[in-house]
Structure formats: structure tokens, C-alpha cells
């Protein structure tokens, strides 16, 4: 189709003026490749990174992780913080539940000496701290644990039994409007941990919902539903959980995928066990009977021993992970242009809402 040269000239002039005033990338054509480059941080689980489609959680976005009690929500966020710190990023943990265990965090690989931590008195204070850290541009990852614990000031100052209908939802809605733009500008990843509640009187469909109203559901680029599916036993002793994570909403790649992995008590995500399983599945690691071999060299009898070998030989582990990431994610941490933002009309599996 022939375009008017004067209109084309005027369009180019106004685009350059907007970019000059508001920064490069403030306006662009939807098909331009640069809009699709999403920097990500690993979740600590390779299978979850693959399920997310981009190699991890996206920077500059809001992410919600929710699930029942003791399902691994905080463990997953601590794994993200550990991965971010290894890349030299600055992280903050807003502990609204006042339940963060620094000893456990250290076991998961978190550098607690350089982790910023706040235990706010009110929900407004927690969200203001988030906003201040975001606007500074100096913090790369912020975790809020949890939305359910963000109690409005009016509720804290009032008496038990007072009605505060919709107060937390209004607070979250206002915060989301304020935070979303600032996060994009500073390229900060903001993760909200959330709890599950039951809707009363629901006869059909899923009665589960998350706290804090609907604003977070709409503003989140990624929503993860994490569940404990079973116990891992060493003889009679329970040593961990089998965990399943569903990508309920995804604005950076195709949604509705899921990942399964193990969370071991006191150790976190069993990443070496995942490498063994994915290596066998994609024929990088040979399995003959109970023996596992890599490039013709035996690495252990049984999955546990093969995993132990990878822990003791990190260079082999890194080589397998790099190869698997290249195979399963294409070019690793970036996603192909045609795969990005395919979820324009995502349907939330839990609520049926369209985003």
C-alpha cells in the first residue's frame, strides 16, 4: 500500500521527538525485534525455566507466585534471589510475614550479608518501600512475602471485629498502578508471594482464589501456581517434596505449561536430579540399567549417585545445563520474536478471567 511521503515524514519526526523526550523504546512498531528481548533470571529449576519459555522470570515485570501452605513458594523466591546474586544483582526481601529464616536462606545459596531485608509494620509501608527501591534504579529483584500479610494501616489501628471491606484490594490496586511503570523504567523484577483462600458458596468450578483483589492478577506478567504433589522418602524418613508448578498466566511466551521438580529439605530445588532426568530424556546422558554415563564415562549407579557426581564435578554439570538450555530454549536467555507476547488474550486457569 502506497503511503503519503508527507505523513511518513511527519510520523518519523514525531517518533524521534517522543524517543528524545521519553527515552529509547518508549514507542515502537509492534513487529520490531528489540521489543521482544526479555532479560530473565533463572528460577533455580531448569524445567520451570523451560516451561516459562524465556529461560526464567522476566526483568521489569510483576510476577505472582501462589499456592497452599508449605508448597515451596518462599523456597522458589529464595532460589531466584540466589541466582540473581550470582549475576551480581542487588536483591531485596520485604518480609511482611516476619517469617524469613536467614539460616535456611543461606543454605539455598543466598548471600544474606548483601540481601536487603525489611519487616514493615503496615501494607502501605511495605508498598512504599517497594516503590522507593524501584525508583532508585539500584535494586534488581524485590520479593514481597506475602500479599495476605500486607495489612492496611486503618485495619491495624482499628479494633478487631471492625469491617474494612475492600481496603486491601484498593491498596493493592493503587500500588499496582504506581509500580508498573516504574518497574519497566528501572528494569526491576517484583515478585509477590500470595496465599490461597476459598470462595464461599461456589458450587461449580474452582472455589480457590488469591488474596488482595483482582489488580495483581491483571498487572502480573507471569502467575505461577505451585503445589506439593507428594513426599520424597529415604527409607521411612521424609526428606523433601515432589512439586508441580503451573504457568497459569504468561505474557512473555505461551502459557499453561507446567514443570515438576523436587524440593529437598534444607537444600532447596534438586537441580542436579533435574539435569540427570532431562539429560536422559534428551539423550545427553546414556542410561543402561541402573548406570548413568556421560560422553561414554560412567557417572554413577542410580539417579542419586549420578546427581552426586554432578555436584562434585560442577564443570560437567555446567556443560550439561548449557547444552540443555541451548536445545530447549533456542538461544538461551532470549526468546524468539514470534514466541513473545503470544498471550495477548490469556485465560486465567483459576478464575476464568481473560487478560
Curated annotation (Swiss-Prot):
Places the protein is found: Cytoplasm
Cellular component annotations (GO), alphabetically ordered: cytosol
Pfam families: RecA, RecA_C
Amino acids binding ATP: 67-74
Highest taxon above the source species: Bacteria
Keywords: ATP-binding, Cytoplasm, DNA damage, DNA recombination, DNA repair, DNA-binding, Nucleotide-binding, SOS response
Gene Ontology molecular functions: ATP binding; ATP hydrolysis activity; ATP-dependent DNA damage sensor activity; damaged DNA binding; single-stranded DNA binding
Family: Belongs to the RecA family.
Protein name per Swiss-Prot or TrEMBL: Protein RecA
Organism of this sequence: Shewanella halifaxensis (strain HAW-EB4)
Lineage: Bacteria, Pseudomonadati, Pseudomonadota, Gammaproteobacteria, Alteromonadales
Designated gene of the protein: recA
Amino acid at each position: 500500500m502506497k503511503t503519503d511521503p508527507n505523513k511518513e515524514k511527519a510520523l518519523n519526526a514525531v517518533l524521534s521527538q517522543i524517543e528524545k523526550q521519553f527515552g529509547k523504546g518508549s514507542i515502537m512498531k509492534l513487529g520490531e525485534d528489540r521489543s521482544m528481548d526479555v532479560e530473565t533470571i533463572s528460577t533455580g529449576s531448569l524445567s520451570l525455566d523451560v516451561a516459562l519459555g524465556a529461560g526464567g522470570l522476566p526483568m521489569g515485570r510483576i510476577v505472582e507466585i501462589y499456592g497452599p501452605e508449605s508448597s515451596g513458594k518462599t523456597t522458589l523466591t529464595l532460589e531466584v534471589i540466589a541466582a540473581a546474586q550470582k549475576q551480581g544483582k542487588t536483591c531485596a526481601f520485604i518480609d511482611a510475614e516476619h517469617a524469613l529464616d536467614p539460616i535456611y536462606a543461606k543454605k539455598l545459596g543466598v548471600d544474606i550479608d548483601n540481601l536487603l531485608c525489611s519487616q514493615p509494620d503496615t501494607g502501605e509501608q511495605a508498598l512504599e518501600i517497594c516503590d522507593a527501591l524501584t525508583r532508585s534504579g539500584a535494586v534488581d529483584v524485590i520479593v514481597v512475602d506475602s500479599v495476605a500479610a500486607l495489612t492496611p494501616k486503618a485495619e491495624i489501628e482499628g479494633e478487631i471485629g471492625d469491617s474494612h471491606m475492600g481496603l486491601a484490594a484498593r491498596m493493592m490496586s493503587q500500588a499496582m498502578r504506581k509500580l508498573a511503570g516504574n518497574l519497566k523504567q528501572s528494569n526491576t523484577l517484583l515478585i509477590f508471594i500470595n496465599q490461597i483462600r476459598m470462595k464461599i458458596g461456589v458450587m461449580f468450578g474452582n472455589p480457590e482464589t488469591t488474596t488482595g483483589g483482582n489488580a495483581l492478577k491483571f498487572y502480573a506478567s507471569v502467575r505461577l501456581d505451585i503445589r506439593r504433589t507428594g513426599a520424597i522418602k529415604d527409607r521411612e524418613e521424609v526428606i523433601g517434596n515432589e512439586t508441580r508448578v503451573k504457568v497459569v498466566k504468561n505474557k512473555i511466551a505461551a502459557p499453561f505449561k507446567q514443570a515438576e521438580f523436587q524440593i529437598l529439605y534444607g537444600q532447596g530445588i534438586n537441580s542436579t536430579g533435574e539435569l540427570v532426568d532431562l539429560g536422559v530424556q534428551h539423550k545427553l546422558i546414556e542410561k543402561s540399567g541402573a548406570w548413568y554415563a556421560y560422553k561414554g564415562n560412567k557417572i554413577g549407579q542410580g539417579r542419586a549417585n549420578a546427581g552426586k557426581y554432578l555436584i562434585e564435578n560442577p564443570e560437567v554439570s555446567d556443560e550439561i545445563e548449557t547444552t540443555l538450555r541451548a536445545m530447549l530454549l533456542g538461544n538461551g536467555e532470549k526468546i524468539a520474536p514470534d514466541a513473545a507476547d503470544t498471550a495477548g488474550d490469556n485465560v486465567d486457569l483459576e478464575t476464568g478471567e481473560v487478560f
